Amino acid sequence: MMTLTRRDFSRLGALSLAARFAPSLNAQSSSRKTGYAVIGLGRIADHFMRAVRQSSTSQITALVSGHRDKADRIAAQYGVPAGSIYNYENFDEIVRNPAVDAVYVALPNSMHAEYTIRAAKAGKHVLCEKPMCLNVAEAERMISACKTANVKLMIAYRCHYEPTNLRAIQLIRSGALGQVQAIDSPFGFNISPGEWRLSKKMAGGGPLFDVGIYSLNACRYLTGEEPEHISAYASVIDHDGRFNEVEENIAWTMRFPSGIVASCTTTYGANMAGYFRVYGSKGWLQVDNAFSYEGLRITAEYQGPKIDELNPARDPSHFLAEADHFSHCVQNNLEPQSPGEEGLRDMGYVTQIYRSAGIAI
């Protein structure tokens, strides 16, 4: 196995990003950092804030939380003044805070639409965690609100900005694998009782919303196509009370216009390593830990030299690339590479998957 240095992978990522995002990288960035208000101070927000601390383009300038003691503690870590700490009731006062250019929405899924729309009305750009929201109608309202307010909306698909995923896309686009025939992608974990993700009202659905969406989105960005047919099956195996509201397991297949067939599985009932494997007429590639925060590894066999590369970058590097991209777009008035429309499309496919599996959403 070849283990690249951080510098090697940073260079690879920069080259891949330059090829993919060439128009945006031609503009000059502002010397002023983009100020973020972080809405929700849970685990994923911690990853994001630690990343922004390392950024030369972004900074944390406000916090929004229902727990003032926690917010005060985090504010001290990031140099956020007391006057820039908000709760969910007075959040709209952020309109008068010039230090806040954008908000990062890191709340339960059911709250994404409300706070994206409120942020847009306050004139703030929005970086919203995935899944975008609960349904297509909410996604459309979020996009409309941001367009009306003339602010940018980006969905936090961090894998779009990660070098190993970009390396896989580059190999596929170059024709190294020949004509892609099929893709496999599972991802899941054994969820603990009592998590908010088991509430349909808060989460919108089960593992498909939470982790299955990684596989769904990966198949779309790997093929560069949109699925034209979807079939799905769902099941509950562990009747232990966890899955009274959401599915435990769901599997689906997608056929793309070129004929590529993708097979995906997600679960809340078992630890299922997240990866994708792409089969082509001239070879194959696989990315292990494809959706993890670190430890991504790409292997490939085709008519060229075999590939076995481990990305040495550590968490929160994905979040840093994501934040830097959005800040660059804000500073240079550019459209993000994963805009609201990307989330809207996934919400449409999630709806199709659930309908095919006989699940009402």
Give the location of each predicted region:
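C-terminal helix-rich "cap/oligomerization" subdomain common to oxidoreductases
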Residues: 3-4, 8-30, 102-104, 326-361
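N-terminal Rossmann-like dinucleotide-binding module
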Residues: 12-79
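Beta-loop-alpha module in the N-terminal Rossmann-like domain of NAD(P)-dependent dehydrogenases
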Residues: 83-145
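Hydrophobic residues in well-ordered beta-strands that form the structural core
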Residues: 87, 128, 153-155, 264, ...
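A contiguous active-site-proximal alpha/beta segment in oxidoreductase catalytic domains
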Residues: 133-194
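Rossmann-like dinucleotide-binding domain that binds NAD(P)(H)
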Residues: 193, 197-261, 265-271, 341
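NAD(P)-dinucleotide binding in Rossmann-like oxidoreductases
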Residues: 236, 240-246, 255-322, 339
